[in-house]
Regions:
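Short glycine/acidic-enriched loop and turn motifs that connect beta-strands
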Residues: 112-116, 159-161
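Repeat-based blade/solenoid architectures
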Residues: 84-93, 139-146
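Surface-exposed loop/turn elements that mediate protein-protein interactions on large endomembrane-trafficking
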Residues: 70-87, 122-137, 166-182
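Positively charged n-region of N-terminal signal peptides that target proteins for export
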Residues: 1-5
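Acidic/hydrophobic-patterned starts of short beta strands in beta-sheet-rich repeat architectures
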Residues: 100-112, 152-153
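Calcium-binding motifs, dominated by EF-hand helix-loop-helix domains
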Residues: 95-99
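Bacterial N-terminal signal peptides
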Residues: 8-16
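Acidic, small-residue rich beta-repeat scaffolds with periodic aromatic anchors
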Residues: 16-62, 132-182
Length: 182
């Protein structure tokens, strides 16, 4: 009898623990029009942060590639190979938008970075070109992305302050992330 109860408890515990693994949330998009921004998620603007979660996204423009997000890193998975793209503490948002004009979307994110002294910055990852670009000014300014209508907007604030200093459309000119103000 004790043996049967022990086996039942073991099986119940096993089934309970087997259900605790991370299960990625998979999403995909329709083909990207170069004028459209695709929001994957934005935890600073309404989406819930899944601190112990994993999200995945497939884009038609990168057939066979799955972009995988963990709170602290973004990866590309293709043919069973995982390639790290960038890190954050955490990565708050990911948008897809063709900033370089090459017809392929870049990954555009707000990330926090630092240990003790933490700043918010914007990273643009050109997956097709294998290059990354950053808008940051550690200790002086914080930069955050959000989407308004069909545009990605950069908000520049004094470091650790709520006061908005500058706001404008995210643009990429001369291999540099810039804020286009009106």
């Amino acid at each position: 009898m004790k043996k049967a109860v022990s086996i039942m408890l073991f099986l119940a515990l096993f089934l309970l623990l087997a259900g605790c693994k991370e299960v990625p949330v998979s999403e995909s998009s329709e083909p990207l029009n170069s004028n459209n921004v695709i929001k994957w998620f934005d935890c600073l603007n309404g989406d819930e942060m899944a601190w112990d979660g994993v999200k995945e996204y497939d884009l038609d423009e990168f057939s066979g590639v799955t972009f995988r997000w963990h709170p602290e890193r973004l990866e590309a998975v293709a043919d069973g190979t995982t390639v790290p793209l960038y890190d954050g503490m955490p990565i708050w948002s990911v948008y897809f938008y063709d900033l370089t004009g090459d017809g392929n979307p870049e990954l555009c994110s707000t990330i926090s970075f630092g240990s003790g002294i933490i700043d918010d910055r914007i990273i643009i990852y050109d997956y097709a070109g294998g290059a990354s670009y950053e808008l940051s000014d550690r200790g002086n300014f914080d930069y955050v992305l959000n989407m308004q209508e069909d545009s990605l907007i950069v908000e520049k604030r004094a470091y650790m302050q709520d006061e908005l200093i500058e706001s404008g459309e995210l643009v990429f000119l001369n291999d540099t992330i810039q804020i286009k103000t009106e």
